[in-house]
Amino acid sequence: MITQILLTQTFIMFILMILGLILSKTGLLTEHGSKDMANILLYAVIPCVIIRSYITDFTMEKLYGLLMSAVLAVAAFAVAIAVSYIIYGMRKPIDNFGTAFCNAGFIGIPLVTAVFGNEAAFYVASFASILNLLQWTYGIVIITRRKDMINIKKVFVNPVTISLVIGLFLFITGIKLPGVINSTMAGVAALNTPAAMIVLGYYLSCVRIRDLLLNPSLYLASFVRLIIIPLLTLLVLYIIPAGHGQIGMITLIAAATPVGTSTAIFAQKFGQDYERAVCMVCLSTLFSIITMSVVMYLAQMWIM
């Protein structure tokens, strides 16, 4: 059942990505427009998704589940970072960054909510927050090879962290937002999947097919990101008692997502190989339509 839902949802995402590609090729979506959409996603859509996920009744069971999801997220990232460093080290910063950091925000959250319902975003939000923290610390060191480039302000003052703090405050205090605000946030949050996939479609339109399909190293990066890391993460979750059940599956779905769009953003920001980063994002996203369903099929036998 989970595999079928996941396969359906990833296929929907693929169609949306093709829509973005068509809009770009016909001139209806420009580079400037794609950047604006990315900003809307980062500064409006994702915060609404995270805050809404915490608008639920406080219980000790949910609090325990939230803490466990954070612990499992740390374990998943430990696997991803270790594997990426062993394979790429500091020689290939884009490949290291891209395989270590997944697309938990734009792909993981909608997939988790499609499989387990909107309340499941409550647990995957902690995964996305830890991802954000690691990208702005360890990720910066990978990309720039310089520790002094870490911006402490951006580590803590960013849309994901701020929305997490607001969400936790609402969850712990039990404060309910007015219906009109809640409905507005729900409408904005619903843009997450369509907007993110359309932006990815724009990225795909900028890549030459030859560069995308005839580079063996890109296939290796996709294999590491989509097969090796998720399967090792599954093994770790199988060993850890808390890794079994719904929270373990949520963690694995997030950890099995393709190369994060942040790889292209960071590459452009810090003067690295932007075109390669875009190719990694696009190729791994295309392959993830199949690989995520396979990984989840195995996970149902191991940790559910």
Language model regions located:
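Alpha-helical transmembrane segments of multi-pass small-molecule/ion transporters
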Residues: 1-304
